């Protein structure tokens, strides 16, 4: 099917081209931009709903503000595809989230129009405030700094910390609150739009400031009463009292899809001489594309799809996804133990806890985008004898590391961490890769750190975690499907700190921590075919390490290779430290560790990226051959 014509958009290379258009053309431009966004994401997949919800806002911001001199900071970044199209990247928009292509988020190295990188939520106001203060210190001519943040991201404490600081500094910062769930705003309409225009006008604010200066000369009781009266009157009509208390001048709510409402308000706040202002904009995810508007998740994250029908093109599943295996196992354990509760930070579907919530609604807690709170909330429940499972992506657990140490680990509280999206995640790239959890958890005293080699082992670890009450315990698992194992009704209890041997050999030992085991087994077959007797061991635990097993592997083999899908400093580092302490590196043992390189891994196909860094069967065999001084030309035979 041919693409829809976009004659206005075809004239836009950069925002200065947009600003050359008359305002009367902007509605049509927004329609074309929405069409182009839908068509591009239908090819690549990605985050569609959020971007469709801010098309008019994106056009208005680049029209009113002098980007890139003025800075627009997008929180999270899911909504930035229209922004990328308008800022010189339309010719590459169909490479979104592909290896070597555009990032799915804002990225400083990608464009001058991306002043701050994103991926995790609730950072935009802090970054914007930092830029505002830096600009003032440099005595630059007045520059507008605009932070665009969603109402979901406003559930994180960091956003309020930044607003509190901005209010205290009286910094000249513009915050656009993109309320796309109607969780804050009352219904919008002509009266609301009129009031927003009225209170955003410089004359109104100037009068307000003069009254404030005059009132400071009056007695305190008069000042307090006047302030409360003004807040009541304006808050009653247009809301915003909370933001007023934080020191922000509040404007809104206004219809974020109506350019006649957006443009005058943005022009007014652009001219404010000082102080922080918050513009409350109401939008709708998936706006303008019927399949997205009708979908329960508003097409938040989609595969490639048919533009006409909206039907997503999904690959055939060969096995149950690890997330679903975790969900199944947790539900099974919860039927046996009414002390088990599930906790997630705004990711019930992504972590599989939505199914748990259907079965046990009173034992499921979604705390919003508040990972720090989630962990300490779990700690509090553990204090009272409950068994909390904090289901969280590896990348987001980083946000709560102090709570993991201070509130859980030091107190030896039995909080269970189900760490999803561990390892390389593919299209979401460096900001979402689960690279560091092994490293930052295994360094904590008496913290049990597990990783399953397949989906059956994951079920065993869920049961083991449920039964473990001596302190914190974690297990990590990747995005995507398992290997197709037949699943038992319920997992088995594992002995803490004990691995297992899958194959016995005599010359080469391959020990794997996690789901790279499928590649390890293929590599073992290839090594055996080359005449190298190979042992395969499943570590199961990075901490406590199975010292007896590791000692035996070191003493009985010429080559020992440790394999994990994580950063430097993880399982392999702990193994090497143990071997060094035991003096097992002094008698000719050739030890190699395969893990992520010392770099942030960008978006791309997991198969291709993991192959490039040597974490596939070919890389494992190459590592063994290199250790033995063998030629590696025959290795390509072992392609999976």
Curated annotation (Swiss-Prot):
UniProt entry keywords in alphabetical sequence = Isoprene biosynthesis, Magnesium, Metal-binding, Thiamine biosynthesis, Thiamine pyrophosphate, Transferase
Listed EC numbers: 2.2.1.7
Q: Which family does it belong to?
A: Belongs to the transketolase family. DXPS subfamily.
**Assembly with partners or alone:** Homodimer.
Name the enzyme's class.
transferase
Q: Which NCBIfam families match?
A: dxs, PRK05444.2-2
SUPFAM superfamilies in the cross-refs: Thiamin diphosphate-binding fold (THDP-binding), TK C-terminal domain-like
The residues listed in the UniProt record as binding thiamine diphosphate, with positions renumbered to this chain, are 78, 119-121, 152-153, 180, 289, 371
Domain of life per record: Bacteria
* Lineage, broadest ranks: Bacteria, Pseudomonadati, Pseudomonadota, Alphaproteobacteria, Hyphomicrobiales
Give the note describing cofactor binding and stoichiometry: Binds 1 Mg(2+) ion per subunit. Binds 1 thiamine pyrophosphate per subunit.
Keyword Electron transport among UniProt keywords: no
Q: What is this protein called?
A: 1-deoxy-D-xylulose-5-phosphate synthase
Q: In which pathway does it act?
A: Metabolic intermediate biosynthesis; 1-deoxy-D-xylulose 5-phosphate biosynthesis; 1-deoxy-D-xylulose 5-phosphate from D-glyceraldehyde 3-phosphate and pyruvate: step 1/1
Write down the HAMAP family for this protein, in alphabetical order: DXP_synth
Q: Which GO terms describe its molecular function?
A: 1-deoxy-D-xylulose-5-phosphate synthase activity; magnesium ion binding; thiamine pyrophosphate binding
